[in-house]
Regions:
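A conserved active-site-flanking secondary-structure segment within enzyme catalytic domains
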Residues: 151-178
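Extended, subdomain-level signal for the structured scaffold at the beginning of enzyme domains
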Residues: 1-135, 143-146, 163-165, 173, ...
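Residues at secondary-structure transition points
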Residues: 115-119, 157, 188
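Active-site-proximal catalytic alpha-helix in oxidoreductases
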Residues: 142, 185-202
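Flexible glycine/proline-enriched surface loops and loop-helix/loop-strand junctions
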Residues: 108, 179-183, 194
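Structural detector of well-ordered beta-strand residues that form the stable sheet scaffold
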Residues: 135-136, 157, 174, 185
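Short pre-catalytic strand/loop immediately N-terminal to key active-site residues, enriched for Gly-Thr
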Residues: 129-131, 180-185
Length: 267
């Protein structure tokens, strides 16, 4: 299903009450909402990723008391994002604790396309995806999940500029800030990662926890312009962005075609 806004309808929101024992002085009101076995969350990082794709969800997951959030890559050397931000992994892929509850892939540009043909990473994701409770992505990270064969027959979204590549990877393209199909949860471009993070916190810890977190983050977006989607943007701005993204669309499409041919050879 596509999701936007609150996970609760109006009637359910009226019934939302603080958990037993909660007071302003007793922040243990959220503490006792922790599961008996804290979640293991694996967030892939890689050279050329978009930092905000990662940071929005990581901020939300990091506020889940007791959860273990692992930033994973092939080794423990810092990786540089597409804007030059360096992020240090906390675990190598080979050392990831098993099993994980959630596997996550952020998007990017050239770095994402490179990952779509990286056998080591794709094999790792395919293996973890078999047992993870949730298989997830933000932005063009869904193309990496698709290249790993994890979106075959699933509805999924991506950044609007590359969403049309998904069918090549046998996924069913869908629009929406967050799209859920069984245990696959994908989000749209970049800033959708914050919505995605809150959505996953609600699924893992409940709506009360997620709404408290939303307030703590003061997440109440009021963008200065209404050009955040192709439908809302002025035609000339949309055309400009489309031209700017054309090389990425082409390279991602070629990478997806190559991956599909690889599947055919081994089927």
């Amino acid at each position: 299903m596509a999701a936007s806004g609150s996970l609760l309808d109006g009637a359910a929101q009226k019934k939302l009450v603080a958990p037993p024992g909660y007071t302003i002085e007793n922040m243990g009101g959220l503490e006792h909402l922790k599961p008996d076995k804290p979640e293991q969350i694996a967030m892939l990082i890689y050279p050329g990723m978009t930092a905000l794709d990662l940071i929005g969800p990581q901020q939300a997951f990091g506020y889940m008391m007791g959860a273990k959030v692992h930033l994973i890559w092939k080794d423990l050397l810092p990786v540089e994002s597409d804007t030059g931000v360096k992020i240090t992994p906390t675990a190598a892929m080979k050392d990831l604790p098993e099993p994980v509850d959630l596997i996550f892939v952020p998007g990017g540009g050239k770095g994402t396309v490179a990952l779509m043909s990286d056998a080591e990473v794709l094999d790792f994701l395919a293996r973890e995806g078999k047992t993870a409770r949730y298989v997830t992505s933000v932005c063009s990270g869904s193309l990496v999940l698709g290249a790993a064969g994890l979106l075959r027959g699933y509805r999924a979204t991506s950044h609007w500029a590359v969403r049309e590549v998904l069918p090549t990877l046998e996924a069913i393209p869908a629009s929406g800030r967050v799209v859920e199909d069984r245990n696959r949860i994908t989000a749209g471009g970049v800033t959708a990662g914050i919505d995605f993070g809150l959505y996953l916190v609600a699924k893992l810890r409940g709506d009360y926890y997620a709404q408290a977190l939303q307030l703590m983050l003061e997440y109440d977006p009021h963008p200065p312009f209404h050009s955040g989607t192709p439908d809302d943007a002025r035609a000339d701005i949309r055309d400009l962005a489309t031209v700017m993204y054309a090389p990425l669309l082409k390279s991602a499409g070629l990478a997806a075609e190559a991956r599909k041919m690889n599947w055919s050879k081994h089927s």
